[in-house]
């Protein structure tokens, strides 16, 4: 089975809350996934995951920390896929440019508030 990880790579609470709430309250209720959707999120709130019990959330203190973790996961298993929601994280873009994250692993969606 392919691993899919959603990445919110910047500390933008108003954007991140919208995405997390939608997945927690709508996707998980309507689709009843077999496992919790996995998110990696930059946030000042270390307890962020408590607000979204239907999701598996890894919280990172800053953009570089999340980029390092994404790169490590991407290199460890090239079957892992990442869905980047509104990506404002230069280290992640550079990792894609220089092949640390392969293009087949990188899905991106831009959105606004």
Describe the role of every protein-language-model region.
Residues 1-49, 77, 102:
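N-terminal subdomain of nucleotide-sugar transferases
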Residues 36-74:
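Conserved nucleotide-sugar phosphate-binding/catalytic loop shared by glycosyltransferases and other
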Residues 110-113:
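A short, histidine- and acid-enriched strand-loop-helix "catalytic/donor-clamping" loop
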């Amino acid at each position: 089975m392919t691993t899919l990880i959603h990445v919110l790579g910047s500390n933008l609470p108003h954007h991140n809350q919208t995405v997390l709430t939608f997945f927690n309250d709508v996707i998980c209720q309507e689709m009843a996934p077999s496992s919790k959707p996995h998110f990696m999120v930059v946030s000042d709130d270390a307890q962020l995951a408590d607000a979204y019990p239907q999701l598996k959330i890894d919280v990172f203190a800053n953009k570089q920390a999340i980029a390092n973790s994404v790169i490590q996961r991407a290199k460890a298993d090239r079957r892992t896929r990442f869905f980047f929601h509104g990506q404002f994280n230069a280290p992640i873009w550079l990792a894609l440019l220089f092949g640390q994250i392969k293009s087949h692993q990188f899905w991106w969606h831009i959105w606004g508030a």
